């Protein structure tokens, strides 16, 4: 469907929000291009949103993305005037809401726009059903009809049978489904979702995203989704708006955003790894599980079994690296009562902590066991696993330890003990 | 300090009080009669029911509202009061306290709501409440006597001034403690101020407001003896006369009766089972 | 209920009180003289220092113990009291309150410690404390008058009975709240009971005990007017006589003076900077 | 060093602890072999420890291991009579402590035995130095000398420079070092350590275990270490006592314990995987990361990069599995503007959810990408990774999902949404 066929649901024209006094003067300065700092100095007020201009098409999932403090939640709250815009106009289905009276605005909030909140904002003293029917209750719809409608939305989000429970009895994911059902019961045209899934744990968040997409296919509402998570934006957004410090930096489909990032900022934003920092073995090494040489083969076997690994490094009392114990040898040693010393395998490769990743790439790829990272006194510091190496190179900072050594950084390291 | 011309603060206050008594005389008399009728209505009403029956009713009420333990305490306590012969004075004290508390609620809660909605109102009301609670209760007797002369009415008026602050304070606190994101939710779904207040703010604030009312009851009870100084009948005046006539025995007996009423009312209001959280089926 | 033979509870108490007055007469007189001397000692002592200087000393004390804001309030407050001409009565009230509070601490804290160590003691003491606090303060005047006849001493005695419970209660609470694993640690390293008490339990309980003392001060202050009924001099008797002579102006003035003293003492004791947590270097 | 050369530090003879009334009668019944249930019924009192009999050699790390409720912390607290034994005798260096007077006992606690607690039990109102010197302070040692000794122990545990801080300013690991230093300052012969590392997070726990071993080599105290963690017992114990429901089940070196488990209970205890439960693909499948076919190649690439994976399954709107997208193809597609559909690779193996692990073992080992687990309608349920398969077979329940399906079990599954 090419762009111009779809009717425009929401039109936002030069909308700005200034927090503080002298907002009039600040708007003036904004108009003739003064920077946020100048405005702050001159009027002491901060610019929350700076002349936002965009259109949202009917039935679209329109994602507004930005880090915290980028003005995204202020912008979305201006759409239903929870926050009064300082300047500019907002049209919904062509009617200008920015100069609507209190009562007209209340009608729009009751009929046209519903909202889903990050921390669910469910009423603790009301059951799930009473929460879901709240919107219609305000409009004076009689009890029988509104409860019937509320049950329908609860069914839609898969919460049938939970209507008489209280919010604090449900998990995070289920509470947010109630938030969704409550918003849908008013049968609004537009759904504002303010970081609706950020408070959920990562696994549930992906499920809720899939569900929202299914829901959108069925009920076809226009959804304005606020998030700070790039993956979430890419997965559910038809179009994405990127915001930084109150300014709209770029608008486009996920592909367009990735294809030609409109300026250096966007590039860095999607790049999300600062390649300038060159990584060393210390950055990606994991805690080394070791067995002391004076232990028996069965202890080594049990440790390996518990960690799901098939080989383990043997160290002496000073944690000096002696060699590798393989599970198969340990099994034989246990049967014929040999000690770990007898089955110690001394062929193994070690790397010092500050070797660059690029140098150890080939060593790691052809070794069949994790590479040992040792300090000058041959003492075990950690091990490098192939997965971590690839992940780090691919820029996934999950695999990169903060200050280049593994986790015990904040405690004074063990070496200090005499 | 004596060099400075002393502003005759005392005289100013006296003249101000006289002026009020003049201008609002009629108005105060109206209130006085209404109040007196209300209190005596309670006393005579309760008076009709024989003490044993009334004791059982009180105990049943205590059981229904709160717990079995308290119901038992109420039963034994009131039987003891009756046995010691302080039944009628107890009824008068009960009427005095209940009236003062009812007025505190009827006047206090709306002020509390008003203060919770308007910041400026809250900023004016809070220091006044502090002053009202630290000022010795005796001082309230003076205006009470001037406007309502002697009898149960000035007792009630003084008790109300002394007992109302906690109800107001806790109403404001209860409403203020409702989380901001819930208020935002009510806005987003288009609630009017009234709908927000009655559907969300007040229900969530009930527990705190009840705590305030409990405190008001205790303060009213602590006023009964002082109220006796302006002619308010009941257990208070039993204690007061015992003190003035140095009859320790009677003083302690009447004191115990007050203690029983105080503990019963305190435990009942503290354990009011708030209906809100009845667990729905799964 | 009248059918049952009424046990003359009142007479029993009266005869009991008379018996005590007889047997312990001398003992009570001794206490009376000691107490009177102590209170008057404070009054004359403070009396020597000119009011302006004393006000500054109080303000400095407030600043050192707690915050600048409270020091300022103390300064202005006491200047106002002096200006209104209530300086001497204020000193007397201060002496009465301080004496009662000191006695509450000297007697109350040890009882609290004893109750925290012995469970049976605690089980006896707690209900008595509840009773003491709900019984109207007036009732305490009776024994006070009998044993110490008229003057500041019965006022102090009645105030102590009314004001002491919070200090005892909070001492027990403070010590009980010390976590069990810390107590086990003191045992494991071989502490004697005294070492456990003074090195671990009391230091950790200080904050709660101070809260108890603050409550006792407020209760003592609320007693000043009642104490005046048994001849205790000070702001209390100013209010009491104003009430009996229906002079509202004077009553309000004296009342304000009491409010100033109350708020000053309350803020100071609440903000005592507990030295414990001074952050070390490194 | 053979067993009999080393002198005996602590001798425990038939020590029992009965909680409740009628302890005398209960001891009688214990003596003539009544079971715990019979005693409970007859006397209403429970048997905490049942006739414990063992010796601890001087300078040994003696580990007492058992699940919670096995009586291990009761037993250790009887050694310094924090808990009074109901019957039996305890000798330290040959002196019987069970009938010592209060003062004699206090001397033993001050000089002979020190204790380290699970939740540290540091005095919050005292600085680290004041905590460490507490033991000597009780004995009336003058300030100068005891602070000098305290500083020494703090140095020993690597906490130099922290002496003026307060406990709540330190991390868990460092607080426990203070606990250790406080116990060492009295220079006791015996150290009782009650689950000293259980409250620490796993990484720090391993470091603390190493440090304890180093410390033991240097200062040579006799250490009685209580734990419920088999690995911890194996790693630091010279000898291990296994306790269950108040009874000592077995005493021996880690090797002996593993070699011939003295009875079925011990075997199960060390075995710790209930092999009877046969595992299926559903048990070990992980959450499947997928990309919707209507997205562009750059979105697929970014998702793969963020997850550190080189291939991703493509699904349609109903999450039906269509094929695999490889990172290399996606890179080419991005350059020459192809859609995901063009580069979709349809050779891939799928397995239904309830196939047994044994059956999919060869499929998984020779496939180079994770195996897709699908339901009857070919919809993606999860993926099986080689590591998880090996780990599960090796009995490491970290890889086994509770009820045989991955995490969204407790939320009503998405399928319900129409």
Swiss-Prot record, chains A, D:
ATP binds at residues 66-73. The keyword Nucleotide-binding applies. PROSITE patterns: ABC_TRANSPORTER_1, ABC_TRANSPORTER_2, CBS. It catalyses: a quaternary ammonium(out) + ATP + H2O = a quaternary ammonium(in) + ADP + phosphate + H(+). One of its GO terms (molecular function) is ATP binding. SUPFAM superfamilies: CBS-domain pair, P-loop containing nucleoside triphosphate hydrolases. Gene3D superfamilies: CBS-domain (3.10.580.10), P-loop containing nucleotide triphosphate hydrolases (3.40.50.300). Pfam families: ABC_tran, CBS. GO terms for cellular component: membrane. The keyword Repressor does not apply. Signal peptide: none annotated. GO terms for biological process: amino acid transport; glycine betaine transport. Keywords: Amino-acid transport, ATP-binding, CBS domain, Nucleotide-binding, Repeat, Translocase, Transport. InterPro entries: AAA+_ATPase (IPR003593), ABC_osmolyte_uptake_ATP-bind (IPR051921), ABC_transporter-like_ATP-bd (IPR003439), ABC_transporter-like_CS (IPR017871), CBS_dom (IPR000644), CBS_dom_sf (IPR046342), Gly-betaine_transp_ATP-bd (IPR005892), P-loop_NTPase (IPR027417). Residues 34-270 form the ABC transporter domain. Its EC number is 7.6.2.9. Residues 284-340, 344-403 form the CBS domain. The complex is composed of two ATP-binding proteins (OpuAA), two transmembrane proteins (OpuAB) and a solute-binding protein (OpuAC). Involved in a multicomponent binding-protein-dependent transport system for glycine betaine. Probably responsible for energy coupling to the transport system. Belongs to the ABC transporter superfamily. This is Glycine betaine transport ATP-binding protein OpuAA. The lineage of its organism: Bacteria, Bacillati, Bacillota, Bacilli, Bacillales.
Swiss-Prot record, chains B, C:
Pfam families: BPD_transp_1 (PF00528). Keywords: Amino-acid transport, Cell membrane, Membrane, Transmembrane, Transmembrane helix, Transport. It comes from the Bacteria. One of its GO terms (molecular function) is carnitine transmembrane transporter activity. Residues 1-18, 66-69, 115-137, 237-242 are extracellular. GO terms for cellular component: ATP-binding cassette (ABC) transporter complex. Coiled coil: none annotated. Residues 90-269 form the ABC transmembrane type-1 domain. The chain crosses the membrane at residues 19-39, 45-65, 70-90, 94-114, 138-158, 216-236, 243-263. InterPro entries: MetI-like, MetI-like_sf. Its main location: membrane. Involved in a multicomponent binding-protein-dependent transport system for glycine betaine; probably responsible for the translocation of the substrate across the membrane. Belongs to the binding-protein-dependent transport system permease family. CysTW subfamily. This is Glycine betaine transport system permease protein OpuAB. It comes from Bacillus subtilis (strain 168). The lineage of its organism: Bacteria, Bacillati, Bacillota, Bacilli, Bacillales.
């Amino acid at each position: 469907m090419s762009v111009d066929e779809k009717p425009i649901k929401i039109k936002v024209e030069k909308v700005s929000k200034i927090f503080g006094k002298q907002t009039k003067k600040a708007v003036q300065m904004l108009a003739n291009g003064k920077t946020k700092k100048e405005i702050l100095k001159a009027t002491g007020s901060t610019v929350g949103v700076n002349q936002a201009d965009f259109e949202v098409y009917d039935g679209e999932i329109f994602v507004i993305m930005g880090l915290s403090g980028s003005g995204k939640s202020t912008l979305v709250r201006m759409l239903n005037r929870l926050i009064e815009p300082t300047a500019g106009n907002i049209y919904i289905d062509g009617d200008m809401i920015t100069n609507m009276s209190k009562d007209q605005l209340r009608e729009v909030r009751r009929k046209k726009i519903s909202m889903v909140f990050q921390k669910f904002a469910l009423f603790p003293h009301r059951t799930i059903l009473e929460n879901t029917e709240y919107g219609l209750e305000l409009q004076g719809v009689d009890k029988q009809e509104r409860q019937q409608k509320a049950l329908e939305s609860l069914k839609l989000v898969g919460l049938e049978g939970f209507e008489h429970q209280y919010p604090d009895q449900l998990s995070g994911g289920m509470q947010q489904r109630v938030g969704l059902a409550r918003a849908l019961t008013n049968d609004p045209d537009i759904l504002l979702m303010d970081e609706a899934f950020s408070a959920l744990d990562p696994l549930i968040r992906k499920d809720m995203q899939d569900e929202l997409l299914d829901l959108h296919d069925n009920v076809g509402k226009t959804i304005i989704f606020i998030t700070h998570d790039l993956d979430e934006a890419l997965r559910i957004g038809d179009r994405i708006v990127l915001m930084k410090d109150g300014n709209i930096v770029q608008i486009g489909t996920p592909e367009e955003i990735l294809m030609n990032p409109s300026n250096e900022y966007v590039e860095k934003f999607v790049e999300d790894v600062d390649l300038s920092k060159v990584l060393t073995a210390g950055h990606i090494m994991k805690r080394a599980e070791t067995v002391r040489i004076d232990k028996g083969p069965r202890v080594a076997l049990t440790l390996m079994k518990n960690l799901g690994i098939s080989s383990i490094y043997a160290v002496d009392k000073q944690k000096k690296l002696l060699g590798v114990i393989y599970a198969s040898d340990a099994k034989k040693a246990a049967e014929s009562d040999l000690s770990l010393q007898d089955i110690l395998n001394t062929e193994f490769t070690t790397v010092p902590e500050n070797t660059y990743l690029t140098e150890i790439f080939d060593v790691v790829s052809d070794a069949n066991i994790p590479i040992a990272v040792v300090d000058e006194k041959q003492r075990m510091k950690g091990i490098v696993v192939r997965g971590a190496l690839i992940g780090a190179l691919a820029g996934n900072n999950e695999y990169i330890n903060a200050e280049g050594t593994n986790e015990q950084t904040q405690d004074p390291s063990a070496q200090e003990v005499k | 300090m004596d060099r400075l011309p002393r502003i005759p603060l005392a005289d100013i206050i006296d003249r101000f009080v006289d002026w009020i008594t003049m201008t609002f005389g009629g108005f105060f008399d109206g209130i006085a009669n209404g109040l007196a009728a209300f209190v005596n209505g309670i006393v005579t009403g309760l008076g009709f029911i024989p003490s044993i029956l009334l004791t059982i009713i009180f105990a049943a009420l205590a059981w229904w509202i709160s717990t079995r333990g308290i119901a038992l305490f109420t039963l034994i306590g009131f039987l003891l009061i009756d046995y010691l012969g302080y039944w009628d004075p107890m009824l008068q004290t009960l009427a005095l306290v209940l009236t003062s508390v009812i007025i505190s609620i009827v006047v206090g809660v709306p002020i509390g709501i008003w203060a919770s909605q308007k910041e400026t109102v809250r900023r004016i009301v809070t220091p006044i409440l502090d002053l009202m609670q630290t000022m010795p209760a005796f001082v309230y007797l003076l205006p009470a006597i001037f406007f309502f002369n002697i009898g149960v009415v000035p007792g009630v008026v003084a008790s109300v001034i002394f007992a109302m602050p906690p109800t107001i304070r806790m109403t404001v606190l209860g409403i203020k403690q409702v989380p901001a994101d819930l208020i935002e939710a009510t806005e987003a779904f288009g609630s009017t101020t009234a709908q927000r207040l009655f559907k969300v703010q007040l229900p969530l604030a009930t527990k705190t407001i009840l705590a305030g009312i409990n405190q008001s009851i205790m303060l009213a009870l602590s006023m009964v003896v002082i109220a006796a100084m302006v002619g308010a009948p009941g257990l208070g005046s039993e204690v007061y006369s015992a003190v003035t006539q140095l009859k320790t025995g009677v003083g302690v007996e009447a004191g115990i009766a007050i203690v029983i009423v105080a503990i019963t009312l305190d435990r009942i209001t503290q354990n009011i089972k708030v209906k809100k959280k009845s667990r729905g089926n799964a």
